């Protein structure tokens, strides 16, 4: 539903705000964008207006060499640096007014552990992916990205379609989804989205954590449970299992 210039401009602004915070070093900063083919070109133009530099294929290969080693491990000296510095390390120059770099990632075929631009960047660079057809194709790309990394943390969606938002929420292995807002600002908690303010985000069992909430004061407080005898209130197995109940399950 990012199908008007105004909505594309807002989505691009949200992307720029999230990508550029702390030079893109935060886990909540945008790393991969999945955009429908029908609005892709116009959205890229909106990103450029917001300060994106679109790297060509040769520049993208140079960036890859200074961001990851030959085994795919992220190189620390290009983490959290300005886009001009990142380009300089890669061997090319970008204008001084550019706020971040974007590489064109392609489609579903370019997502996977062997495709490094689909992994976490931790700097002022993002990858732009394009999908055609039904929204399910975008969800398939989301699944693939989280197989590369980032399960449990977060994602965002710029949409006014409640069905699309619901379908993403039902399948994405994340603890928080930001709708039409900068991911890094929204994840950390805001008076305009109801998320508890925090700098620590639980990622649930997806991320090896015990909670999937924003870590807040309640998580640092010890709770003492006082249990007194009460009348037994034991549901039947049929009530517990519902449609999965089979006759004889409660026979010892």
Give the residues covered by each predicted segment.
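ALDH superfamily catalytic-core signature
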Residues: 1-112, 236
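Conserved C-terminal structural/oligomerization subdomain of aldehyde/semialdehyde dehydrogenase
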Residues: 92-252
